[in-house]
């Protein structure tokens, strides 16, 4: 069974390069939001799942296992499929998982959703890093640094917004 590997860097006009770059930056804000939201919501998730804090801590492990497996699978997926549609699918999956979290009433269901969330987050992480490199080629360094700064923006927004959501 043969597979096609997309060669990099791709050639785009300047306008398209910057539109794609802005989209990858926005994806990293979303990634920061989802990643940064777990800590502040931990006590609420434990209450919602009817378990103690020691049991709810499994969400960290399960989400990380999902992230690990999603990273491995995501790398192969971005090599074999058009990257932007895969990235869009991962963002949609991440959004669905985040929307399902408040609806889970048992720990096992929450762990399943967190596993999927971790895998989707990994797909966004791997995808944005890969695609940004393909768009900018050897000149990717400042864009890569900026993109990872946008992760921090999302994580900060998650911390700042949680107290307001509780009211």
Q: Can you annotate each of these PLM segments?
A:
Residues 19-51, 129:
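Extracytoplasmic
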Residues 23-24, 106-114:
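Short hydrophobic/alpha-helical segments at membrane-entry points of transmembrane helices
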Residues 32, 36, 118-126, 156:
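Small-residue-rich segments within alpha-helical transmembrane domains of MFS-like 12-TM solute carriers
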Residues 42-43, 74, 154-166:
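Small-residue (Gly/Pro/Ala) motifs that create kinks and tight helix-helix packing interfaces
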Residues 46, 50-57, 145:
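Small-residue hotspots at the loop-to-helix junctions and early N-terminal turns
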Residues 63-65, 152-154:
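Short hydrophobic/small-residue motifs within alpha-helical transmembrane segments
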Residues 69-108:
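Conserved MFS/SLC helix-loop-helix module at the cytosolic interface between two early adjacent transmembrane helices
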Residues 113-149:
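Cytoplasmic helix-loop-helix junction between adjacent transmembrane helices
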């Amino acid at each position: 069974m043969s597979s096609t590997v997309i060669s990099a860097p791709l050639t785009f006009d300047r306008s398209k390069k910057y539109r794609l770059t802005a989209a990858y930056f926005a994806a990293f804000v979303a990634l920061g939001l989802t990643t940064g939201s777990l800590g502040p919501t931990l006590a609420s998730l434990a209450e919602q799942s009817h378990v103690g804090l020691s049991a709810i801590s499994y969400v960290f492990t399960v989400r990380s296992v999902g992230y690990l497996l999603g990273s491995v699978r995501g790398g192969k997926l971005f090599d074999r499929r058009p990257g932007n549609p895969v990235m869009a699918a991962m963002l949609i999956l991440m959004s669905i998982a985040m929307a399902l979290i408040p609806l889970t009433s048992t720990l096992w269901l929450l762990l399943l959703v967190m596993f999927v969330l971790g895998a989707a987050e990994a797909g966004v992480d791997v995808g944005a890093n890969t695609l940004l490199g393909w768009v900018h080629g050897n000149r990717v360094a400042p864009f890569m640094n900026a993109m990872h700064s946008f992760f921090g923006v999302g994580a900060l927004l998650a911390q700042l917004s949680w107290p307001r959501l509780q009211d």
